[in-house]
Amino acid sequence: MIRLVRELYQYRGLLISLVQRELKARYRGSFLGFLWTFLNPTLHMLVYVLLFTVVMRQNIPNFPFFMFVGLLPWIWFSTSVGGGASAISDRRDLLTKVRFPAQVLPTSVVVTNLCNFVLSLPLMLVLGMAYGQWPTWHVVLFPVVVLIQLTFTLALTYILAAINVTFRDLQHIVSNLLTLWFFATPVLYPLSTIQDESARSLMLALNPMVSLMTSYQAIFYEHRLPDAEPLMALAAVSVVLLWAASSIFESRREEFAESI
């Protein structure tokens, strides 16, 4: 893990260059360009608002804002994991022609989507203020939650990217699992809607994204401190998972260029 972090720092210029390149290329040639950073989550929100408030008649106060608070970090997570799984196998040109630090590829995917997440935050804050929900001092813990999500997302992405080099079906499996994972995470509904306390505890234990989503909702929607115990447990698990992911990555590093 130390070697991986050291090499990421050593090749930080390359990482920044890849992130900038991806951000510029993502909407190049489109008429609206950079505006899609805001339009994508907004269109997602409108579809779910229509479904849950008109069709299913959910009665959650300020539902569009509630959903947006969870939707933005979920989009960051899902696009990072979905795109990161194939980050190495899709860049055979780089790995076979030059001595290239493979860990930069999945990292650049995660960081690129993190940038999109951060750029979308003003839209979320404006939406909240439109509903009379102004940010409170609890936002000081927002960077902590983001750091925990970043650690967990990087760990999962490294593992998937390493495995996908030899098992290409994984990227398609991940894409479908993310859809199921989304509905098993309280993004479109509060965790409190699950009446059974044992079921809620099981969700917190088995689904790492639950504590992240409820933490964002606590900070921006409920204006309170996140529940410390599940969040700190996830932080510890994420660090251990990142260590394991870096070990897997190191053990397979030499195989990447040969396998793809």
Curated annotation (Swiss-Prot):
<feature type="transmembrane region" description="Helical">
    <location>
        <begin position="201"/>
        <end position="221"/>
    </location>
</feature>
<dbReference type="GO" id="GO:0015774">
    <property type="term" value="P:polysaccharide transport"/>
</dbReference>
<feature type="domain" description="ABC transmembrane type-2">
    <location>
        <begin position="32"/>
        <end position="252"/>
    </location>
</feature>
<dbReference type="InterPro" id="IPR013525">
    <property type="entry name" value="ABC2_TM"/>
</dbReference>
<dbReference type="Pfam" id="PF01061">
    <property type="entry name" value="ABC2_membrane"/>
</dbReference>
<comment type="function">
    <text>May form an ATP-driven O-antigen export apparatus, in association with RfbB.</text>
</comment>
<keyword id="KW-1003">Cell membrane</keyword>
<dbReference type="GO" id="GO:0015920">
    <property type="term" value="P:lipopolysaccharide transport"/>
</dbReference>
<feature type="transmembrane region" description="Helical">
    <location>
        <begin position="63"/>
        <end position="83"/>
    </location>
</feature>
<keyword id="KW-0813">Transport</keyword>
<feature type="transmembrane region" description="Helical">
    <location>
        <begin position="173"/>
        <end position="193"/>
    </location>
</feature>
<feature type="transmembrane region" description="Helical">
    <location>
        <begin position="229"/>
        <end position="249"/>
    </location>
</feature>
<feature type="transmembrane region" description="Helical">
    <location>
        <begin position="139"/>
        <end position="159"/>
    </location>
</feature>
<keyword id="KW-0762">Sugar transport</keyword>
<comment type="similarity">
    <text>Belongs to the ABC-2 integral membrane protein family.</text>
</comment>
<keyword id="KW-0472">Membrane</keyword>
<keyword id="KW-0997">Cell inner membrane</keyword>
<dbReference type="GO" id="GO:0005886">
    <property type="term" value="C:plasma membrane"/>
</dbReference>
<feature type="transmembrane region" description="Helical">
    <location>
        <begin position="109"/>
        <end position="129"/>
    </location>
</feature>
<protein>
    <recommendedName>
        <fullName>O-antigen export system permease protein RfbA</fullName>
    </recommendedName>
</protein>
<dbReference type="InterPro" id="IPR047817">
    <property type="entry name" value="ABC2_TM_bact-type"/>
</dbReference>
<keyword id="KW-1133">Transmembrane helix</keyword>
<keyword id="KW-0625">Polysaccharide transport</keyword>
<keyword id="KW-0812">Transmembrane</keyword>
<dbReference type="GO" id="GO:0140359">
    <property type="term" value="F:ABC-type transporter activity"/>
</dbReference>
<feature type="transmembrane region" description="Helical">
    <location>
        <begin position="31"/>
        <end position="51"/>
    </location>
</feature>
